[in-house]
């Protein structure tokens, strides 16, 4: 299977551009530069493939990760790995809170275990800016979540269902306000359909959804939720 992008991008994308434009090919290049061992070590540090720790009887458990041929490449853009929405949200929170991974809880004012520093504070600051541009810039994939007064940042994901490549899982993880995040919101739509009657206000233009991707459904839903809770 050939790895490709949905649309053609410039060949000289920076790391920031790769994230903003959601380039699969760019992600593969970055992963190869990082190297498989470094990638493995970082994934282990994030705990996204471990059993979730939370005060619930029943929790989703990620599928075992087997490092076979091309696994590094497919993991780099999210197709070669499974995790739970809870763990993904926790990881994104760590990415923007100064780099500290805090285990989630459903208990208010629970005594928090010692958090683990998984990225530097400087890297976290840069990621906040990039995630904001995913929503606010012309090249970004999540402009439908750009709601006045909320300063939303985030990252889109359009993936194949595990074991069924015909079905899609479209996700959007948002953080807001992006300059000093207080909230993280995860929206996941399994095998969504395009609403042919829905007219979007897309960057000042009225249009229908041209693609069945997270930028046109999960992002739209997240924007509506953020407006409601705001």
Q: Predicted regions span which residues?
A:
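Beta-lactam-recognizing serine transpeptidase/beta-lactamase-like catalytic domain environment
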Residues: 1-200, 214, 218
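Short, gly/Ser/Thr-rich active-site loops of penicillin-recognizing serine hydrolases
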Residues: 112-115, 205-230
